[in-house]
Regions:
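N-terminal strand-loop-strand
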Residues: 1-14, 39
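Tryptophan-centric aromatic hotspots in well-structured domains and transmembrane helices
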Residues: 11, 48-53, 77, 100-106, ...
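The catalytic Nudix box helix
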Residues: 13-49
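Functional cleft and adjacent loop/helix regions within the main domain
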Residues: 14, 20, 61-65, 140-141
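Active-site-adjacent beta-strand/loop module that shapes the phosphate/pyrophosphate-binding cleft
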Residues: 51-89
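NUDIX/MutT-family hydrolases
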Residues: 74-81, 88-122
């Protein structure tokens, strides 16, 4: 899990937009690399469908003041196996937009407890699905 820069005790997985011409797996890998500098990964699985959450009213008000009009996010989820070392992680590789300032290794089923409330349901679905895949994958390596 990664701690969001500029927010006290807010944790999440890397995420971001899909550029024109990218598929969502390529976008997921690019965002992981841009936000954490992690390159030593192997794609393991993807969640079978996009998942959506809506922003709560307090977040929408902040967005409105910033000129943003989106009301939620639709996300595609990918599971990567990190086969590098912790010294690969670097949050300042793209200093123009630092997303994270901390990380911690956790059991995947702990992740839903650490995210903001409006993301919890999506994280619970994704983490429950990926937990089974992780157990099988680890048994093979």
């Amino acid at each position: 899990m990664f701690g969001r820069a500029g927010f006290d005790n807010q944790w999440q997985f890397p995420q971001g937009g899909i550029n024109k011409g990218e598929n969502h797996q390529v976008a997921a890998l690019r965002e992981l690399q841009e936000e954490t500098a992690i390159h030593s990964v192997e794609h393991v699985a993807e969640y079978p469908q996009a998942l959506r959450y809506d922003f709560p009213s307090n977040v929408l008000e902040k967005f409105k003041k910033m000129g943003r009009t989106n009301i939620g996010q639709e996300q595609y989820w990918h599971l990567f196996f990190f086969n590098g070392s912790d010294d690969e992680i670097n949050f300042t590789s793209h200093p123009e937009e630092i997303e994270f300032n901390a990380y911690k290794w956790i059991d995947i089923m702990s992740a839903p407890e650490l995210v903001v409330d409006f993301k919890k349901d999506v994280y619970l679905k994704v983490c429950s699905y990926f937990q089974q895949i992780i157990q099988k994958y680890i048994g093979q390596i």
